[in-house]
Amino acid sequence: MPKRPVLAVTAGEPAGIGPDLVLRLPELAPEARCVAIADHALLADRAAALGLNLELADYRRDRPAPAGALEVLHVPLAAPAQAGRLDPANGRYVLATLDAAIDGCVSGEFAAMVTAPVHKGVINDAGVPFTGHTEYLAERTGTGKVVMMLAGGGMRVALATTHLPLREVADAITAPLLNEVIRILHADLENKFGIDAPRILVAGLNPHAGEGGHMGREEIDVIEPALDALRAEGINLIGPLPADTLFNPDKLAAADAVLAMYHDQGLPVLKHASFGAGINVTLGLPIVRTSVDHGTALDLAGSGRADPGSLLEAVRLAEQLAGHAGRR
């Protein structure tokens, strides 16, 4: 029997639903060997609050835990954690769990990492500038540029820009940016998703993709020339297309991914189709990282009502991507 890949699963913000979700992994029974990276006592206390009769086993690299147990790589909390109540004292703890997962992936101990949600505000309140998982992973791995992609509902949607105010998006869409983003997207579709000659649909920026320049010239002046240069190298790009008709079933069936120009152009359609089971993937990293596509849901923490569907899908995709990355 092939050896199961070992995935690092960070439990995220200790006051949120991340610990609740991670504790559900044994019953969800993913094929991969999942190691929770969290404070052992935090998980034990949350399991008791949820009424879960679950064995927590200390992680040993060469000794998998018994069936039904959850393996835990212990990272200590800085202060006791209570479900639903943020404490900036634990901001650095959250980053320490990420560091353990990143280091394990870089060293080859873990095949991939899966992240439960963190709370950006409380990490910043701890005195640590933090804009999100994606940027932190890029900095820690020495990666100059990464691309955010969400998957779910039969779609893969990557973003040319991410968390920008809408008034800044048009200025951010440049030929060098598109060149870099599309190269990363194309390379990871091939190398991590195992797709040969991937087909990518590219959205325009303006309504009706600019309507021939009458509703904006970004398509004519920036996007189309950038796509033409990449097409000349053999990258299969279709667009720029009007975003309001791009997401129809026929177009999606003929493509492997969509590139949207900005966050709320591409993600509402995907989240409508996949809410509760969507996955965030960071492209361009030297490691495999997937994540849930929802937040910390402080109001649900410790209640037993948190839906683990997105975490399970993130684990499954991480295992798939790690397998492709290991073969190429």
Swiss-Prot record:
Pathway: Cofactor biosynthesis; pyridoxine 5'-phosphate biosynthesis; pyridoxine 5'-phosphate from D-erythrose 4-phosphate: step 4/5. Keywords: Cobalt, Cytoplasm, Magnesium, Metal-binding, NAD, NADP, Oxidoreductase, Pyridoxine biosynthesis, Zinc. Its main location: cytoplasm. It is found in: Cytoplasm. It catalyses: 4-(phosphooxy)-L-threonine + NAD(+) = 3-amino-2-oxopropyl phosphate + CO2 + NADH. GO terms for cellular component: cytoplasm. One of its GO terms (molecular function) is 4-hydroxythreonine-4-phosphate dehydrogenase activity. The keyword Cell wall biogenesis/degradation does not apply. Binds 1 divalent metal cation per subunit. Can use ions such as Zn(2+), Mg(2+) or Co(2+). Substrate binds at residues 133-134, 271, 280, 289. Its EC number is 1.1.1.262. Its cofactor is Zn(2+); Mg(2+); Co(2+). The active site is located at the dimer interface. PANTHER family: 4-HYDROXYTHREONINE-4-PHOSPHATE DEHYDROGENASE. Belongs to the PdxA family. Homodimer. This is 4-hydroxythreonine-4-phosphate dehydrogenase.
